[in-house]
Amino acid sequence: IRPFKAYRPQLDLVEKVSTLPYDVMNSEEALAMVEGNPYSFLHVDKSEIDLPKDIDIHDKQVYLKARENLQKMISDKVYIQDEKPCMYIYRQIMDGRSQTGIVACVSIDDYIKNTIKKHELTRSDKELDRFNHVDYTNCNTGPIFLTYRHKNKIDFIVKTWTETKTPVYSYKSEDGVSQIIWVVDEKDVTSELSAIFAKIDYLYIADGHHRSASAVKVGLKRRQDNPSYDGDEEFNYFLSVIFPDNDLYVMDYNRVVADLFGNSFDEFMNKVSEKFDITAGDGIGQFKPKVKRTYGMFLEGKWYKLEAKEGSFNLKDRKSV
């Protein structure tokens, strides 16, 4: 990993700039959220809100508008670039629990060599959307969420910095999460962090498979366009926030199925039983899996434990993790 010169919002504008991720809302919701707020980052991340409604969200005009909006915010000094390469410490606090990570740039070569492990397949349409967004804006507008097996030395550096330095931002975002950020602007500290991370075997993508795949493809395109590249150019890296495993809270990721696709209850359960061993719950609260390849299912007012049968999954899918 390495430090970089981030573009950061002015202190008095940070709460107006800050917004929810682009993929948790549709265009109409985003338009309502930015009403009266020209500083919202949604003008960059969902720039179709500033175009006529009949324009497709994947039209070239959308990406050009994102670039235009970002460049205007920079020229209007909504964002100021740090004068020297820094790393950043990012802390989130929700429901009394905090997690703290390091914001830095990560090499696309680590992604290509599988030093950065993936656990999801990606959709080509979503990849193309993020590819165009990064390519047109010439910017990583959202970090990849990575994790690693914690190192005591990194924990100590982060703890020392956050206890002895004043955060540059500290506010509560619209979803109720406290957002606290420190700027790590001392070269000896960023160099030490880079050296420690260089000895870590693997990083793991917790969130951002489409964004990372797209950023890597943009980097490879820029390499083709610049055959004399030396590897130090910014397109060889992508923005990431890296959390240690001992500070990471993995939230439930559930799916709601609208109907049983014409199956009766018994027919549906029979089909599920082809791939899973089913155990009815005891009726007390939600079933939360505690071991691999085990799932909870809530159907017709009752919880069930599903355990994947041998042969129902591809062992090769585990290689990357």
Locate the predicted segments by residue:
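Surface-exposed, charge/polar-rich loops and edge strands
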Residues: I1-S320
